[in-house]
Every structure is written in C-alpha cells, then in structure tokens.
Amino acid sequence: MRPKYLIPGLGLVMIMAIFGYFAGCSKDNVPTNQVTEGSLTDPDFVPVQGQVDSYLDSTVQIFSAALDNSDRAPIDTQYVRGNYSPLGTNDTVTCVYINGWYIIYVAKDNAFMAFHTTDSIQFQKDSVVVESPLDMDYMHFVRRWEFASKLTSVTHTNIDGYVNLVFAGMDGEFASVNGTKNYNVEWNYVGQDSSVVALYNMDVTVDNVTIYHSPGAGWPSACPSSGTIQADIAQSYTVTKNSIPNTLTRNWIVTVSINEGVATVKVEGLNKVWSYTKDICEPSAH
C-alpha cells in the first residue's frame, strides 16, 4: 500500500497572513525567555499543524505498507501492482531479490506528475537473514519516494521522503518499531503578480512504537498502541511580490505520544507551546 499524502492548501486567508508577516503585521511582544500557550487558530501554527497531521496519517500508512509484507514475499509483481494501483500502461514495476533484500521499484509518469518509489525489505530470524517472511521475527523496511508535479505554471506541490524502520519481535504478541523518517514538502503558490514557495523539512525519530498482532488476522490495522514520535521541522516561506523576494523561516519541535491510536501532540516554537490530540487509527484488540 503506498502512503497517503495529504497536502494542506494554505488558502487565501493563510496567504494573506504570510504577506502580513513581511508587512510587519505579525508581532510578538512576549519576552524571549517566556514560553506561553499558543492558540490552535494562530496563523503561525495552522500550516504547521496541517503538516504534522499529514505526517501522522502517512506514518500509519507507512506502517501498513511495511506490514503488508509480513505474510508473503514481496516478489510477486501482480501483488505489488495491486498495492500500487492504479497503474498505467507506461508505468513501471520491478521486483528483485538480491543479497538478502527484496527491492521493489515503482514509477508512474503522465502529463500531470511523476512518482517514483523504491522499497527495500529484509527479513531475519534470530539475527540471520531469511528469504520467507513466514520464518521471521525481525523486518527491516526502507522506502524512498519522490512526487513531482508537471503543472508548474499553476499552484502545485512536490514531495520527497525517506523511511528507515525496524520491526522487532514479530513472532510474538506485538512488534516494536524504531527508526527514522525524512519528509519534505515544497508548496508553490502561483498568482498573477506574486508567488509563494513554502518549504517544510521534517526529520523524524520513531521510538519504541508498539503495534499489536491479532491472532488469526495478523496485522490488520497497523495501528500503534503506544510509543513516541519526535520531529524537528524547518519551515520557510519565500514571497515574491512585484518581483521582490522576501523570506521568512521558522523552526519547530514536535513530540507525539501515542496511546491506543490516539496521538497527543505538543508543538514548540516562537516561544509558544501548542497542544492537541488527534485520532490517527483504530488499534487491534489485545
């Protein structure tokens, strides 16, 4: 299953807020050593929450994509095609097994976009590489992907990312997931006399996330029951108006604690802290 990419459109209000930054309309008189509670409607925070929520949704999708390989070898081209459908006649799917790794490459290309993803999957049992997932207790999953819009004369989005996850204890009641992710979004607003390039870079750590196994059903939801996810976000806007560019940068620290499919999110930045909860999935019964 390929990840679900949710691209938050900033909208007219957000674009006006961005322009307001450069016009001196965004002011903060809080001393630099004082941290206050932020409002969820703060225009500084709204686009960040959109990216965090998108990232959380895509994380569950990534867990699901990895666990799809837990009951069958990912060498079956038709199986891969089903997971990455729909595929056009000019799209490419290749599957190979080499040096203990299953490597899947999928490329979609049409008049609107180009999408490329490579999955690398290795199974182990007692620290020894095995070919069949039915014998494993450990899975290493690596994904690299890139989505590029070809409609560059209008508002559009480009994305690329990298995932490196280890699933341990897969022969038991639950799997423990650890690893890293990198997620980059480039959002381009194209107006008649102005443009905005919004960049989001997220460096993510997945720490001891637990996913329970359902007897008789395997890993049906890939929904985490516990664990912590942390992210550092670098955000920038370059606004060009009347041929004059201006750039604004922001940095954020995100901490997510998961309890039975509910994420408690804390975002820190600009001497403020924002907190909220989000239902991300329905965990398996255990």
Predicted regions and their residues:
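Bacterial N-terminal signal peptides that target proteins for export
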Residues: 1-11
